[in-house]
Amino acid sequence: MRVDGREKTELRHIHIHTNYLKHPEGSVLIEVGDTKVICSATIEERVPPFMRGEGKGWVTAEYAMIPRATEQRTIRESSKGKVTGRTMEIQRLIGRALRAVVDLEALGERTVWIDCDVIQADGGTRTASITGAYVAMVLAFEKLLQAEKVSKIPVKDYLAATSVGIVEEQGVVLDLNYAEDSKADVDMNVIMTGKGQFVEVQGTGEEATFSRAQLNELLDAAEQGIFQLIDIQKEALGDIVSHIE
């Protein structure tokens, strides 16, 4: 039994609150256990200079954490005047993952700005951001469809992400909280589509190694969790699902 009472391959309690903010075209508050992230999607009727004239859209992301999202207050990056390497890595990961399932030609010459703001962190903030951002983005696309600016919702598949790891005395576990993540021998983030295709796998041994058999076990656990997350996304999207499938 894990520190929070879960089974080894059991997700934390997940809830996705849709249309959480008033102004963005799409927004959610995603809760993954005690991790809470506000994800918003903004549609801009232009593309970056390097995309002009190509007849395709673009998806990009920004990620931030409020000072007391963590146990000890952290200084805002805006106060430092620069974005940390960790933040830059996560922003690129979110944007890259979402672009994998967006039909950029069907989107047209528009930019989707994804903003992920962590208001409470207890492990898995980047994977929660991806799972929530997908829903926020689809909500924004639904508004484009209603306004007859696109002929269909420009996504090719569902997308969700979770963490898996190897924790001493537990073995392979799914959806690590901070306490588990901080002592994990192996930590891995997995992003997959609804068809079971991998978008990205980030795995690291923390002063430890892992075998091919353990890798397979980690990926199996992640796949199981991601399919559950996609079911939760579908429930949150409601009738919009009929425009995707």
UniProtKB/Swiss-Prot annotation:
<keyword id="KW-0808">Transferase</keyword>
<dbReference type="InterPro" id="IPR002381">
    <property type="entry name" value="RNase_PH_bac-type"/>
</dbReference>
<dbReference type="InterPro" id="IPR036345">
    <property type="entry name" value="ExoRNase_PH_dom2_sf"/>
</dbReference>
<protein>
    <recommendedName>
        <fullName>Ribonuclease PH</fullName>
        <ecNumber>2.7.7.56</ecNumber>
    </recommendedName>
</protein>
<dbReference type="InterPro" id="IPR018336">
    <property type="entry name" value="RNase_PH_CS"/>
</dbReference>
<comment type="subunit">
    <text>Homohexameric ring arranged as a trimer of dimers.</text>
</comment>
<comment type="function">
    <text>Phosphorolytic 3'-5' exoribonuclease that plays an important role in tRNA 3'-end maturation. Removes nucleotide residues following the 3'-CCA terminus of tRNAs; can also add nucleotides to the ends of RNA molecules by using nucleoside diphosphates as substrates, but this may not be physiologically important. Probably plays a role in initiation of 16S rRNA degradation (leading to ribosome degradation) during starvation.</text>
</comment>
<dbReference type="GO" id="GO:0009022">
    <property type="term" value="F:tRNA nucleotidyltransferase activity"/>
</dbReference>
<keyword id="KW-0698">rRNA processing</keyword>
<feature type="binding site">
    <location>
        <position position="86"/>
    </location>
    <ligand>
        <name>phosphate</name>
    </ligand>
</feature>
<comment type="similarity">
    <text>Belongs to the RNase PH family.</text>
</comment>
<keyword id="KW-0548">Nucleotidyltransferase</keyword>
<keyword id="KW-0694">RNA-binding</keyword>
<dbReference type="InterPro" id="IPR050080">
    <property type="entry name" value="RNase_PH"/>
</dbReference>
<dbReference type="InterPro" id="IPR015847">
    <property type="entry name" value="ExoRNase_PH_dom2"/>
</dbReference>
<dbReference type="GO" id="GO:0000175">
    <property type="term" value="F:3'-5'-RNA exonuclease activity"/>
</dbReference>
<dbReference type="GO" id="GO:0016075">
    <property type="term" value="P:rRNA catabolic process"/>
</dbReference>
<keyword id="KW-0819">tRNA processing</keyword>
<dbReference type="GO" id="GO:0000049">
    <property type="term" value="F:tRNA binding"/>
</dbReference>
<dbReference type="GO" id="GO:0006364">
    <property type="term" value="P:rRNA processing"/>
</dbReference>
<dbReference type="InterPro" id="IPR027408">
    <property type="entry name" value="PNPase/RNase_PH_dom_sf"/>
</dbReference>
<keyword id="KW-0820">tRNA-binding</keyword>
<dbReference type="Pfam" id="PF01138">
    <property type="entry name" value="RNase_PH"/>
</dbReference>
<dbReference type="Pfam" id="PF03725">
    <property type="entry name" value="RNase_PH_C"/>
</dbReference>
<feature type="binding site">
    <location>
        <begin position="124"/>
        <end position="126"/>
    </location>
    <ligand>
        <name>phosphate</name>
    </ligand>
</feature>
<dbReference type="InterPro" id="IPR020568">
    <property type="entry name" value="Ribosomal_Su5_D2-typ_SF"/>
</dbReference>
<dbReference type="InterPro" id="IPR001247">
    <property type="entry name" value="ExoRNase_PH_dom1"/>
</dbReference>
<dbReference type="GO" id="GO:0008033">
    <property type="term" value="P:tRNA processing"/>
</dbReference>
